[in-house]
Amino acid sequence: KATGLIWDERCMWHNSGLYFGPQNTSPWIEPLPHIENVDTKRRIKNLLDASEVSRNLEVTEVEKATKNDILRVHTKNYFEEVLKVSNSGGGQLAKRSKLGSTFIGDLGIDIALIAAGGAITAAKNVLDGKLNNAYALIRPPGHHAEANEALGFCVFANAAIAGKYALDVRELDRIAFIDWDVHHGNGTQSIFWADSRAYTISIHQDNCFPPGSGKIEEIGG
């Protein structure tokens, strides 16, 4: 059994908007290309192909997430907000915009559902015994998104959605998340805060992002 690469070119079409850093949009600040842009992920895929590592991977098609998949993690109100912004030409989602703008493009919810579905696809293929392990190369990212809001460029909490699939649909007893990123995986932590079936570990820089989040004393409810 192989290692799987979960890949869908449509994830590279996610529109993350322009980037103003910690500032709100302003006519006096020149925006930068967004730091969560397509090049960051496509470069990984290109390197896998150029180095021929891809030949040893099982490239697996994504099964798009359903509304029910999303609602295992996110509130109905938040899902409807994403749908409304997506169907109205796109725009900012994050209420706490100074803590990381989260933009979704016109009809961008379809891409966000593909990304969430990519995480589920990885879990499903491993649980079905088709793959030993899998890497989902997807965007928009997810570990900052909380149950009721976007944050830090993240629309849906992809890993948490895959975790809920494993627990609620496949009826696993216990799962664990190891989040290795300079930023705290606040979204995954908050979603499973009171769920003893999930163990969340975040390895991150202290007091980086979100500010004040991810202290060693945070051990669940």
List the model feature ranges, each with a label.
Residues 1-221:
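HDAC/HDAC-like amidohydrolase catalytic core signature
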